[in-house]
């Protein structure tokens, strides 16, 4: 990644990441994807006493279905167990294939456990914080929740995800594609609107100009 790309991507990263205060909750919800740091961060939050339960949500999505044989949620559970989280505090949602399904299917499980009206601490990738927040407000507007993510810089996140089998360009393509999805998904009713600031729009257009188009829709 050259200097121009790094500068533009940094603008996108800072806007997509909400940096909400981490508060104690009744359940941690770890959203599945290719990056294992979400499971590690969820286990860390549990061990630090932020919540007594963890729900891992994720079947196989567009970046994991060709790489893994087990669901994202089951992979995350195994990581959490290795990190000392007791198995009996972990809930599994392993049917979802996208963020909307993550939320809807997780809500079903949490309802059955008497946790749907409790405080939730949602964990996803740093650049997914804003998109998950907007999707939660759409699919589950009454939810009491905050967003957090693994404590990684942009460069660390890219490095960690590359270590799990993606190229640098593929990782960046996903981040750029999610900026486009902020508008398209709001138009489709998948999340509440999050208008792009002009600086972010210019950064997105710069990344497209530089060829980071692999995850764009259309």
Label each PLM-derived region with a short phrase.
Residues 1-171, 216:
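A structural signal for short, hydrophobic/glycine-enriched beta-strand patches
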